[in-house]
A protein has these predicted regions:
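Conserved catalytic palm subdomain of right-hand nucleotidyl-transferase polymerases, strongest
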Residues: 77-81, 361-377, 423-426, 432-438
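A short acidic-Thr-Gly-centered motif at the start of a beta-strand
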Residues: 1-5, 43-45, 353-368, 511-516
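Polymerase palm active-site segment centered on the conserved acidic dipeptide of motif C
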Residues: 182-213, 217, 450-462, 537-577
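Extended active-site and interfacial segments that coordinate phosphate-rich ligands
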Residues: 336-365, 377-396, 547
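Conserved catalytic core of nucleic-acid polymerases
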Residues: 329-331, 406-526, 531-536, 566-577
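Conserved "right-hand" nucleotidyltransferase catalytic core of DNA-directed polymerases
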Residues: 1-12, 17, 23, 111, ...
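Metal-dependent catalytic core segments for phosphate chemistry
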Residues: 19-23, 371, 378-408
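Conserved DEDDh/DEDDy metal-dependent 3′-5′ exonuclease domain
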Residues: 2-8, 15-142, 376
Length: 577
């Protein structure tokens, strides 16, 4: 057996939150070993070779540390789940080991009884290890065009986020329950107000033709009691339309759209089935129809109730902490995604009930919440790739949105702010034109004027479009990014670059935070912000270090536009972002 080759590892336990490890299986250079004691596995893992497993960072290693006191240095760990997500975040069938078995035509098999150790369980574990080894070989080929830096960074970030998930984020349960009660009461009152304005309607059901019996009298077949009586009283045997009084259903977006059109609403966005799109963001913009505002407020409250309810339900019964799931490579741009619950969707403080929602998330006793975020991240990434000194200077020393206003010929700074992000997100001419109150023609003119006045942008856009024709482009740190469409290529590049520098800053902060003996726990990593619990008295030391790590991340990648950010200290998330 060649002890320099990677060792593949898998364990079987008595559940996802286990207190027993039944068996650990290792395979190195084709030699399979079963381990039933910590001593046996510890001996097998001794050395400098790589240790490879599927979700090794997220499950196996934390369990081995907790139950068998076994630790493997992170520099030795390679996780095929991380590798699979990095290679192709949108892999058909997903990233589970079972899907890899299908991809490789080497099924991992099925087993579901984790209550006791059985020969079948051991056989299942051995097969998992063999599938992992084959997946690893395939992934090494897939990742051959990725830089080592990008692969190492994503493994480090997975380690950090695993600790964040384990730590969780403390929920102020009393405040959350009070907020939930308030939201439900307000929603109930609004429901009453809605039904005062949205009255039941008579709707046609079907045409009914009265029939006669053989003796010439009216038959009751096919008629309701009321219809039978009316036909008898009127003596009219002509077909008639059956109608019913249909109450307004607040749960039906289709009905909401129909009623609002009766009130004078002219929808502009439609579903593929030609139904008007109804959501609170669209309806809040309909200022001249009170009924639209009423529905918008209701839909907003409905969403807030569901959100706060999901946080309360997710909080651990013993600790009140939320251990949300984070996929560190969930988006095609390699941004993190969040679920169970989705804390990336917690409303901003300026949104309706946003401040109260963010006040739900706090720090433990003796700690403060410290949040830091990057300043103008996507525009700084744009400036890096354009490498236009004048534009970069506007970001660093001027007002970039006023500059963009002039470049596009827009009437206001607010329009310019909306315009530039719409442009970067690949918006079409109609969307761009709507920013200034026009249509596709105006949008095309604005875009053309902007690109004519900023040739570096036009050149970058053309260059990325040519590269994206192959279906992939190179990311900031040498990773490969999959492109879904040409119009999304630039946005994918910029968002990915932003995600990469934030991950690098996180990696540096974890390294230097420990070196400086700071006492902190990450609780949230959401796009361009990082939230942490920091021991009281160390807040400013941590905050200054966090911002310096962000700046260092920009220097590490030799960005043409320097990065910076700011940090805030408070009792809750409402204070820190």
């Amino acid at each position: 057996m060649d002890s320099s080759k990677p060792m593949f590892l898998d364990i079987e336990t008595n559940g996802l939150d286990p207190d027993t490890i039944w068996v650990a299986v290792t395979m190195q250079d084709g030699v399979v070993q079963e381990h039933y004691t910590p001593e046996s596995l510890t001996q097998a893992l001794a050395g400098k070779f790589k240790v490879v497993g599927h979700n090794l960072i997220g499950f196996d290693m934390p369990v081995l540390w907790k139950l068998w006191n076994i630790h493997v240095d992170k520099s030795r760990i390679e996780d095929t789940l991380v590798m699979s997500r990095l290679s192709n975040p949108s892999r058909e069938g997903g990233h589970r080991l079972s899907n890899w078995g299908e991809i490789l035509n080497f099924p991992k098999g099925d087993y579901n009884d984790w209550s006791c150790l059985t020969p079948e369980m051991v056989k299942y574990c051995i097969q998992d290890v063999k599938v992992t080894a084959k997946a690893y070989d395939k992934l090494k080929l897939e990742l051959r065009k990725f830089s080592k830096e990008s692969i190492d960074l994503e493994h480090d970030v997975q380690h950090i986020i695993q600790k964040q998930t384990k730590n969780g984020w403390l929920l102020d349960l009393r405040h959350s329950m009070d907020l939930l009660a308030d939201l439900k009461e307000t929603k109930m009152k609004l429901e009453w107000a809605v039904h005062q304005n949205f009255k039941p309607k008579w709707v046609d059901v079907k045409e009914v033709t009265p029939k006669l019996k053989k003796d010439g009298s009216l038959s009751k077949v096919g008629l309701t009691d009321d219809e039978f009586t009316k036909v008898i009283e009127s003596g009219c045997m002509e077909p008639f339309m059956r109608r019913v009084l249909k109450p307004f259903n607040l749960g039906s977006r289709k009905q909401i759209g129909e009623y609002l059109q009766d009130f004078g609403w002219k929808p502009e966005k439609f579903t593929p089935t030609d139904q008007p799109i109804v959501d609170e963001s669209i309806l809040f913009a309909v200022k001249d129809i009170p009924e639209a505002q009423l529905i918008a407020k209701y839909l907003m409250l409905q969403k807030r109730v569901a959100q706060v309810q999901s946080w309360v339900e997710a909080a651990n019964d013993d600790t009140d902490r939320i251990h949300g799931y984070v996929n560190t490579l969930g988006a095609v741009t390699n941004r993190m995604t969040h679920s169970k619950p989705n804390l990336a969707q917690v409303p901003a403080s300026y949104s309706p009930y946003g401040k109260q929602c963010r006040q739900c998330f706090i720090a433990r006793d003796g700690y403060k919440l410290v949040g830091f975020d990057a300043s103008g991240l996507e525009l700084r990434m744009l400036a890096h790739y354009m490498n236009d000194q004048e534009y970069t200077n506007e970001i660093l020393n001027g007002d970039i949105h006023t500059a963009n206003q002039g470049l596009a010929g827009l009437e206001s700074r607010d329009q310019a702010k909306t315009f530039i992000y719409a442009l970067l997100y690949g918006a079409g001419d109609s969307k761009l034109g709507s920013v200034a109150g026009g249509g596709a023609k105006l949008g095309g003119q604005l875009k053309q004027r902007f690109m004519s006045n900023l040739p570096a942008f036009a050149n970058l856009k053309d260059s990325i479009a040519r590269e994206a024709a192959s279906g992939v482009i190179k990311g900031l740190d040498g990773r490969v990014l999959h492109i879904r469409s040409e119009h999304s290529a630039l946005n994918t590049l910029l968002q990915s670059a932003g995600a990469i520098v934030m991950k690098k800053a996180l990696q540096l902060l974890e390294e230097y935070g420990r070196l400086h003996s700071l006492d902190y726990y990450f609780v949230g990593n959401i796009h361009d912000e990082v939230q942490a619990e920091v021991r009281a008295g160390q807040e400013d030391s941590y905050g200054r270090l966090a911002v310096s790590c962000l700046e260092a991340a920009g220097s590490f990648y030799s960005l043409n536009c320097p990065l910076t950010g700011e940090y805030k200290v408070g009792e809750s998330w409402a204070d820190t972002h």
